[in-house]
Amino acid sequence: MIYIYFIYLKQDDPKKSTMRKLERFGIARRISPGGARDKLMLTRSADTVLSKNDRFIAERSGICVIEGSWNREDTFAGLRFPYGRRLPKLLAANPVNYGKLEKLSSIEAVAAALYIMGFQDDASAILSKYTWGQNFLQLNKNPLDEYREADPEKIPEIENAYF
């Protein structure tokens, strides 16, 4: 499995943190912001969209996500990460933001990244820790499959076709 890291901002209820749960299962590891420099960083402020071409970065250094509140999304607005990537548009399946565009939980974001880079089994495995997890893959099956096959320059066309 690809190494999964997260930066925990302590902005939400720790009992509801999807990444803290993965940490308890030994699947994810908490790091400081400085520890994310060489990682494939999932961030909405990135200019580059995640694609299958990013697989080698994830295999080499792992994937990192910021675990924080959607209500305080500007926390890292000024920071740039060398391997920062934004996810293509997807719908959330978590109970708090179900059906909302781009309001993914951290575990959904990591699972989407894994799926798009060709690690579908790993994506399914981490989502299995939540009763609603597999709903994310079902809800987004068609766009995820198209993103997985597409070259980076085609992803905006796919986003527009679905959303």
Curated annotation (Swiss-Prot):
Subcellular location field: Cytoplasm
Gene Ontology cellular component list: cytoplasm
Enzyme class at the top of the EC tree: transferase
Any Pfam family: Ribo_biogen_C
Main location: cytoplasm
EC number: 2.5.1.157
UniProt: S-adenosyl-L-methionine binding residues: 18, 66, 87, 106
Protein's UniProt keywords contain Membrane: no
Any single GO BP term: enzyme-directed rRNA pseudouridine synthesis
GO molecular function: 18S rRNA aminocarboxypropyltransferase activity; S-adenosyl-L-methionine binding
Keywords for this protein: Cytoplasm, Ribosome biogenesis, rRNA processing, S-adenosyl-L-methionine, Transferase
Reaction catalyzed: an N(1)-methylpseudouridine in rRNA + S-adenosyl-L-methionine = N(1)-methyl-N(3)-[(3S)-3-amino-3-carboxypropyl]pseudouridine in rRNA + S-methyl-5'-thioadenosine + H(+)
Function summary: Aminocarboxypropyltransferase that catalyzes the aminocarboxypropyl transfer on pseudouridine corresponding to position 914 in M.jannaschii 16S rRNA. It constitutes the last step in biosynthesis of the hypermodified N1-methyl-N3-(3-amino-3-carboxypropyl) pseudouridine (m1acp3-Psi).
Family to which the UniProt record says this protein belongs: Belongs to the TDD superfamily. TSR3 family.
HAMAP family for the chain: TSR3
Name of the molecule in the record: 16S rRNA aminocarboxypropyltransferase
